[in-house]
């Protein structure tokens, strides 16, 4: 038995509600007899009548929610049954909980199937166990622990858990969980709710810099980059990324592939400025395309711009080789030569910013396009003129004109000759 005097501090330290849980200061004030607040009474989860689920009777909504979370398909079937509706009105004395559960079940009508069943069970479990974790398709996790769950799943290669966490965010189930808590008075969760809505937008994009990788780094701000080239360097800060990549290229000769989803997501989640343009270019290009490689170079250049003392000669030299096909997109031969020379310069210096600016300068691209358009017009005009000169009509007209000129010249010569003869 726990002594009566210790019940209050034990209840406070073990409280499921983070806001109600005692801190060290609370414990100190309790021991000094100056504590001004007490732990809230433990909520009574008992039911008036038992409910049977999977051959077992439950007299506690929290225990029932736990069982529902594990066997969610069977739970959804029972929740939609007449037997459960009867128990709901006879077995629960909490009228507010009855009203909430009725609303959840009614609103789920017509949404059968795995997704509908999972959402129904998740919402019911949250209502029955408001202080408990989120339960979805057998996964039980507190939303503030979702980042750790995802990190562990990625580390272990647990694809099933990765898919479940992604669904929780993508389908708005995590956001709904927060909203449900906010309605019940947890106004402190407003910021977390907004954060998960932002994550929902990230996971809906499939391109590099988004998806589950972006969620992984957003939920774990101190997680090191999981990209293979830097996996052994423990790059948890953006400051350490470029030196690690440069060292890897120095040792291995290349990164293997330039467009890396983990590196893109790591940069996007840690960088101070906006990288929307680079991410958009990555999303609308294939990973092996020149456009995608230039966009990835732009992300790395953003990092170098933030830490300008970090020159990367090995990485930049490799990038210059990778981006040689980008020079071919320019039409002017002299411009291609100048860009190639500039790229060789930045390769030696390790200037990623200069490399990106050289290949993404909109003014140079526009000037080159304008020059090509002018050259096309001049070529078209020249071909049209050649065609006109070679046409039968022009040849006949030229001959007629020649005949007239020849006749005129002959007439002049004849006239001059005649005058000369008679004058002589």
Q: Where are the predicted features?
A:
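A conserved short helix/loop substructure at the end of the activation segment
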Residues: 14-27
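Activation segment of ePK-like protein kinases, specifically the conserved APE
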Residues: 18-19, 32-39
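Terminal low-complexity "docking" segments
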Residues: 15-16, 58, 79, 392-396
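Regulatory extensions appended to serine/threonine kinase catalytic cores
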Residues: 36-103, 125-133, 138-151, 155, ...
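ADP-ribosyltransferase catalytic core
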Residues: 98-122
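Conserved C-terminal C-lobe helix
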Residues: 2-16
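Juxtamembrane boundary at the C-terminal end of a transmembrane helix
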Residues: 417-424
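Long, charged low-complexity terminal regions
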Residues: 144-402, 421
């Amino acid at each position: 038995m726990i002594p009566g005097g210790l019940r209050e501090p034990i209840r406070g330290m073990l409280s499921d509600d983070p806001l109600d849980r005692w801190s060290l200061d609370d414990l100190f004030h309790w021991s000094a007899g100056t504590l001004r607040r007490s732990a809230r009474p433990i909520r009574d989860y008992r039911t008036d009548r038992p409910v049977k689920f999977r051959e077992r009777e439950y007299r506690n909504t929290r225990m029932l929610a736990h069982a529902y979370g594990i066997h969610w398909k069977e739970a959804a079937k029972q929740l939609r049954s007449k037997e459960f509706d009867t128990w709901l009105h006879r077995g629960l004395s909490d009228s507010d909980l009855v009203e909430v559960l009725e609303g959840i079940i009614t609103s789920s009508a017509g949404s059968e199937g795995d997704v509908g069943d999972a959402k129904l069970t998740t919402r019911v479990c949250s209502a029955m166990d408001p202080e408990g974790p989120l339960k979805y398709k057998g996964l039980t996790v507190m939303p503030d622990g979702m980042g750790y769950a995802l990190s562990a799943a990625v580390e272990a290669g647990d694809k099933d858990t990765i898919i479940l966490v992604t669904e929780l965010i993508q389908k708005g189930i995590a956001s709904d969980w927060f909203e449900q808590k906010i309605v019940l008075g947890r106004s402190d969760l407003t910021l977390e709710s907004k954060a998960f809505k932002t994550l929902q937008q990230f996971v809906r994009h499939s391109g590099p810099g988004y998806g589950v990788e972006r969620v992984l780094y957003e939920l774990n701000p101190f997680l090191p980059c999981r990209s293979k080239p830097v996996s052994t360097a423990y790059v948890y800060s953006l400051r350490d990324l470029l030196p690690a990549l440069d060292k890897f290229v120095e040792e291995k000769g290349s990164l293997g592939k330039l467009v890396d989803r983990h590196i893109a997501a790591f940069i996007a989640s840690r960088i101070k400025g906006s990288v929307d343009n680079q991410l958009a270019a990555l999303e609308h290009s294939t990973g092996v395309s020149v456009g995608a490689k230039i966009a990835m170079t732009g992300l790395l250049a953003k990092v170098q711009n933030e830490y300008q003392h970090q020159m990367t000669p090995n990485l930049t030299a490799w990038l210059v080789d990778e981006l040689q096909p980008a020079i071919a997109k320019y039409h002017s031969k002299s411009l291609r030569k100048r860009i190639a020379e500039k790229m060789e310069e930045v390769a030696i210096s390790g200037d990623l910013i200069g490399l990106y600016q050289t290949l993404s300068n909109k003014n140079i691209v526009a000037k080159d396009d304008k020059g090509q358009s002018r050259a096309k017009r001049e070529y078209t005009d020249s071909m049209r003129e050649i065609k006109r000169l070679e046409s039968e009509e022009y040849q006949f007209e030229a001959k007629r004109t020649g005949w007239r000129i020849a006749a005129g010249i002959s007439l002049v010569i004849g006239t001059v000759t005649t005058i000369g003869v008679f004058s002589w």
